[in-house]
């Protein structure tokens, strides 16, 4: 690992047993979520029990929401009395790298942006139970961001279905639990039971969708006259509007001037300001369904593909 700046020391209680200490030694390269950026924290601050709210342990969507409020850090060293972790937000500089263990069932390729999701795959356990301390470490799974986006979309769809189950199909939907990535078949076994996280995701999703649809339709209707005029000279717009007519062919020869657009006039909103707002919210719709990438795989002189269980050198995501 190249030298970086900030590191967090996570204190290990003195009452830990030897088997539990040995289990911690195997956690190098895994990710924990820090509640705050500090030099000194305790193991209880990053354990799964710290995510419990009101005596209720969060389900998969609840963990996703909690991840957004915390700071990911990669465990770089495990010493007898403390764990050294590198916060990815402040500890990993643009010139530094850390080694991230690939605990996902898929390969990580050089250049892949990596997102973190809770354990969601069938037959995969990422928990480390420390019986002597009565604590559990539940590590997230690093996945390529495109795969993580699809998984989160499936989890939200399952949660929405649970909010309004169909009496005609009381069972589960098997299609939502199986997906394919790079030729591999992956089975999801996620815990989506609590309605609070589903309502939070659904509220953001519906508000963004309603805004994008209504404002996008208004902007398209406003731009239609100009699109028709541009179709006389632009083959792509021409095909888009399907103007296969003699009028189109004549217009291509005449080259009419496109009508000028007024910013205000009789319109409800200034056109270009509305277009900027719509593009911004359309991008936020994707951000609602996926965690942003935290790092990028960067293999300098090693293999370009990092297999499951191996260490992947990663750099800060730009």
UniProtKB/Swiss-Prot annotation:
Provide the leader sequence positions.
none
Where does it primarily localize? Answer: virion
Q: Which GO terms describe its cellular component?
A: host cell nucleus; viral capsid
Q: Which GO terms describe its molecular function?
A: structural molecule activity
Organism superkingdom: Viruses
Under InterPro entries, the record lists:
Herpes_capsid_2 (IPR002690)
List the keywords (alphabetical).
Capsid protein, Host nucleus, Virion
Q: Does the keyword Cell inner membrane apply?
A: no
Q: Which Pfam families match?
A: Herpes_V23 (PF01802)
* Compartments it resides in: Virion; Host nucleus
- Family from the record: Belongs to the herpesviridae TRX2 protein family.
Per its database record, what is this protein's job? Structural component of the T=16 icosahedral capsid. The capsid is composed of pentamers and hexamers of major capsid protein/MCP, which are linked together by heterotrimers called triplexes. These triplexes are formed by a single molecule of triplex protein 1/TRX1 and two copies of triplex protein 2/TRX2. Additionally, TRX1 is required for efficient transport of TRX2 to the nucleus, which is the site of capsid assembly.
Q: How does it assemble?
A: Interacts with TRX1 and major capisd protein/MCP.
Q: What is this protein called?
A: Triplex capsid protein 2
Chain's gene name: TRX2
């Amino acid at each position: 690992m190249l030298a970086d700046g900030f590191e967090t020391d996570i204190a290990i209680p003195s009452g830990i047993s030897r088997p539990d200490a040995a289990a911690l030694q195997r956690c190098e390269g895994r990710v924990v979520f820090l509640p705050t950026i500090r030099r000194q924290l305790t193991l209880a601050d990053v354990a799964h029990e710290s995510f419990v709210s009101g005596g209720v342990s969060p389900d998969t969507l609840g963990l996703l929401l909690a991840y957004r409020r915390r700071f990911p850090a990669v465990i770089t060293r495990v010493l007898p009395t403390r764990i050294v972790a590198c916060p990815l937000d402040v500890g990993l500089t643009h010139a530094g790298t850390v080694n991230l263990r690939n605990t996902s069932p898929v390969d990580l390729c050089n250049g892949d942006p990596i997102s973190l999701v809770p354990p969601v795959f069938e037959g995969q356990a990422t928990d480390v139970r420390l019986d002597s301390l009565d604590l559990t470490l539940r590590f997230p799974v690093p996945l390529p961001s495109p795969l993580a986006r699809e998984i989160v979309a499936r989890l939200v769809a399952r949660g929405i279905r649970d909010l309004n189950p169909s009496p005609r199909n009381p069972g589960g939907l098997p299609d939502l639990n199986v997906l394919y990535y790079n030729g591999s078949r992956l089975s999801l076994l996620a815990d989506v039971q609590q309605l609070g996280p589903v309502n939070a995701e659904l509220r953001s999703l519906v508000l963004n969708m309603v805004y994008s649809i209504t404002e996008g339709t208004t902007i398209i209707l406003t731009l239609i006259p100009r699109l028709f005029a541009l179709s006389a000279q632009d083959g792509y717009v021409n095909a888009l509007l399907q103007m296969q007519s003699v009028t189109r062919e004549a217009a291509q020869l005449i080259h009419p001037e496109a009508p000028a657009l007024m910013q205000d006039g009789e319109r409800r909103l200034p056109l270009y300001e509305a277009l900027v707002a719509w593009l911004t919210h359309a991008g936020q719709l994707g951000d609602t369904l996926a965690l942003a990438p935290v790092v990028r795989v960067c293999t300098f002189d090693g293999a370009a593909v990092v297999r499951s269980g191996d260490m992947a050198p990663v750099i800060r995501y730009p």
